[in-house]
Design a protein with these regions (language model features):
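Conserved, single-site charged/polar hotspot
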Residues: 1-244
Length: 244
């Protein structure tokens, strides 16, 4: 099996309609439709165009980070993201989509932001800025900045830092997974282990407690310890194995 070494836009995305550890329906939708749904659920169509663009780029970057790092599949789940804001972004099945938001997403769905010097899409956290406050983008704050004349990238740099850059026209392809469908454990070897190690190293940038391991393709003791640390962080059984 293979996995893209660079970020890509998935043709479709599978959304778990509830918290990750609870049973709920999985819904697979075209990726642009997912972004349109989340944007229509999270922000207001009457906002300034630059605020809408900034929020759409943040929404897209966040979910692409989930896809690229295999955040949920690496924990054994069969979906890319959930529908709940306690973990991810608000997704409401079969909701109405605002026309101007739909048109903007058609233009922007294959663009995302990242940090300079990094390949992965930015895990662009955001909150409404009124009833909830976070370290990322303030949705209402972005509207205020847009009303002051800020461009979409100026708004994003205000919240995420001056070292972010815009990637445009990313390739579109089917979702691929590095986990082969059978357990990877101490002694395993092959391309699947190589991509497991690469994925762990990407995740370790946001969770520095996870030790960096060489991408050798051999599931050695250092890899096992990195897996155990990952499992402890995400409240999984720390058995040092991927898959059961």
């Amino acid at each position: 099996m293979t996995i893209a070494a660079l970020p890509y836009i998935p043709k479709t995305i599978t959304v778990h309609l509830g918290p990750p550890s609870q049973w709920a329906e999985n819904m697979t939708v075209p990726f642009p439709d997912y972004i349109k749904n989340v944007a229509s659920s999270e922000i207001y169509p009457t906002w300034e165009p630059s605020a809408l663009r900034a929020n759409i780029l943040a929404i897209t970057s966040f979910v692409l980070n989930r896809v690229f790092t295999e955040f949920y599949p690496s924990q054994g789940y069969d979906f890319q993201i959930t529908s709940t804001t306690a973990y991810d972004q608000k997704f409401i099945p079969n909701r109405n989509i605002f026309e101007n938001i739909s048109l903007l997403v058609d233009e922007l769905f294959d663009d995302y932001i990242r940090r300079q010097g990094f390949i992965e899409p930015l895990s662009a956290q955001f909150c409404n800025g009124t009833t909830s406050i976070c370290d990322g983008l303030s949705q209402w704050g972005s509207q205020e900045l847009a009303q002051q004349g800020y461009s979409s990238m100026d708004i994003l740099r205000r919240y995420y830092g001056s070292d972010i850059e815009l990637v445009t026209d990313a390739p579109i392809r089917d979702v691929t997974r590095s986990y082969p469908g059978y357990p990877l454990r101490l002694g395993s070897a092959g391309e699947e282990v190589f991509w497991l190690q690469a994925g762990l190293d990407r995740i370790a940038r946001n969770y520095p407690a996870i030790p960096i391991v060489p991408t050798t393709g051999v599931f050695d003791q250092a890899t096992e310890e990195a897996v155990r640390t990952f499992q402890r962080i995400f409240n999984l059984t720390p058995d040092g194995m991927i898959g059961t």
